[in-house]
């Protein structure tokens, strides 16, 4: 089963928190990264089956946009990312994430 990665970057912490919450509740995905991108921008990354990541991205974008002053800066999904992408980006399943892996 192909595994995808989906990333949403928002302006402000409440929007990314709402996105992360909606993403893991809307689909069977694993939250693999959640961090500050720059200044007041944050990003969240999830992994899972392609169809589940698509569904979680839709929910995350909607939740972030519904947040007071919430703005989605950008979003992207990579179906079946190659190993070298995992090597250079923080999207791999880490030891902290492994117990929650879906």
UniProtKB/Swiss-Prot annotation:
One Gene Ontology CC term in the entry: carboxysome
GO molecular function: structural constituent of carboxysome shell
Keywords assigned by UniProt, alphabetized: Bacterial microcompartment, Carbon dioxide fixation, Carboxysome, Photosynthesis
Main localisation: other
GO BP term, pick one: photosynthesis
Cystine bridges: none
Organism superkingdom: Bacteria
UniProt keyword annotation of Cell membrane present: no
Gene3D superfamilies: 3.30.70.1710
Subcellular location, record wording: Carboxysome
Span of domain BMC: 4-90
Metal-binding as UniProt keyword: no
HAMAP family, per database record: CcmK
Task of the protein: A probably non-essential, minor shell protein of the carboxysome, a polyhedral inclusion where RuBisCO (ribulose bisphosphate carboxylase, rbcL-rbcS) is sequestered. Hexamers form sheets that form the facets of the polyhedral carboxysome. In PCC 7418 there are several CcmK paralogs with presumably functional differences. This subunit probably only makes heterohexamers with CcmK4. Heterohexamers can also make dodecamers, formation depends on buffer conditions.
Assembly with partners or alone: Interacts stably with CcmK4, forming heterohexamers that can make dodecamers. Heterohexamers have a 1:2 CcmK3:CcmK4 stoichiometry. Upon expression in E.coli forms oligomers that could be dimers or trimers, but never hexamers; bulky residues in the pore region probably preclude the formation of homohexamers.
PANTHER family, alphabetized: CARBOXYSOME SHELL PROTEIN CCMK4, PROPANEDIOL UTILIZATION PROTEIN PDUA
Similarity field: Belongs to the bacterial microcompartments protein family. CcmK subfamily.
Protein name as annotated: Carboxysome shell protein CcmK3
Record gene name: ccmK3
């Amino acid at each position: 089963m192909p595994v995808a990665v989906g990333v949403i970057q928002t302006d402000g912490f409440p929007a990314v928190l709402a996105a992360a919450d909606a993403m893991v509740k809307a689909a069977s995905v694993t939250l693999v990264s959640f961090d500050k991108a720059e200044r007041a921008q944050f990003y969240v990354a999830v992994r899972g089956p392609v169809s589940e990541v698509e569904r979680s991205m839709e929910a995350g974008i909607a939740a972030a946009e519904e947040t007071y002053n919430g703005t989605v800066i950008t979003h992207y999904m990579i179906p079946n990312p190659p190993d070298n992408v995992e090597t250079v980006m923080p999207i791999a399943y880490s030891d902290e994430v492994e117990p929650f892996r879906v």
